[in-house]
Amino acid sequence: MRNIILALLLAALLSGCAAVVVGGATAVGAAHDRRSFGTVFDDNNIELTAYDQLNRDRELTTQSRVNLIVHNGVALLIGETPNDVFKTRVAKVVNNVKGVRRLVNELSIEEAASIGQRTRDATLTTQVKASLLQINDIRDFDPTRVNVSTARGVVYLMGLVTRDEADRVVDIARRVRGVQSVVRVFEYVS
């Protein structure tokens, strides 16, 4: 009995530590973000809620590969789905989540990307993020404020940025070898 109580106590303590670590990481990320901590929290909640609702549709989840990125209430959908009906179903689910201000549906109608393609996309995302570190001529620019996602060689850029920052980020992303095109999903600050 004593061992069971100790195990439960240890589990409770460890789960509390995990929450502190995760919460601390979110707080550090929010310190560099132009969004308020509350907005960062809301965006994460929108993503979790949308994924939960999408995962309830087994037909949809087994035949589609959907990635959702939410930034400042703007929901970006990328990935693949087999037909327009599924593309519309995904959009409807996400658009109905409380807090979504705008939906950008970039799902492509085709077979799911291969593991090789997904690996190339992840590599491109990393290369673009690393390339943004070279921006040092724009005052107070912080590359962590730019969300970079890639699907089938197309790079999607999100964030609250100035127009100068956006132009420079897009220019750098376009120069990364392997990038097919760049899509701006930015919101602008003055």
Task: Kindly label every feature range from the protein language model.
Residues 13-16:
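C-terminal motif of bacterial Sec signal peptides marking the signal peptidase cleavage site
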